[in-house]
Amino acid sequence: DNVLMEIDLLYRDYGIREFYIVDDNFTADKAMVKKFCNEIINRKYDIAFCNPNGVRLDTLDMEMLTLMKKAGWYYLSVGIESGSQPVLDHMKKRINITLVREKVSIIRKAGLEVYGFFIVGYPTETLEDIKKTVNLALELDLIGANFSCFHPLPGTAIFEMLVQNGKIKREKFTELFNSTYADVAYSPDNIPVKTLK
């Protein structure tokens, strides 16, 4: 309700007509999305929405996407991450390549643009996996794609695995993160840093 009140204020008093929903979990609660979209539709606002930072593909269905389009959505970013199923499985993404293709297709059928996020340099990844990722990005009906280098984040299982295997040093992790995701903070044994760059 607070978000709707803020949108009302910004729309009415400041003439704002476009809103970025920066919430990775926005589509996780379908009932909330339905309620939110219906509230916007009932207001009859001339308004546009997008999710530029990404939502989970496995939360999307045609009913939700159609309602979002009716409420003013024009664009979704989605975290696809890899075109390699073994890499997706190791990341515990709970998606498969077939699902990626299906979900991107229904997003487009609902009339929304799609932007994809991908990660390269994941610990189990090979050059062949990276080629599969690039090929998937080219194959999908995306308006754009962002390829970020893998960054092992402290507190994650993959960070701990890399520390335990001697691939990174825990005390040096701040050096890894004084950079952008375009920088290479870690490179798998079989892929030189220069190749990832």
Regions flagged by a language model, labelled:
Residues 113, 128-197:
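C-terminal accessory regions of radical SAM enzymes
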Residues 1-117, 122, 135:
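Radical SAM [4Fe-4S] cluster-binding motif and immediate context
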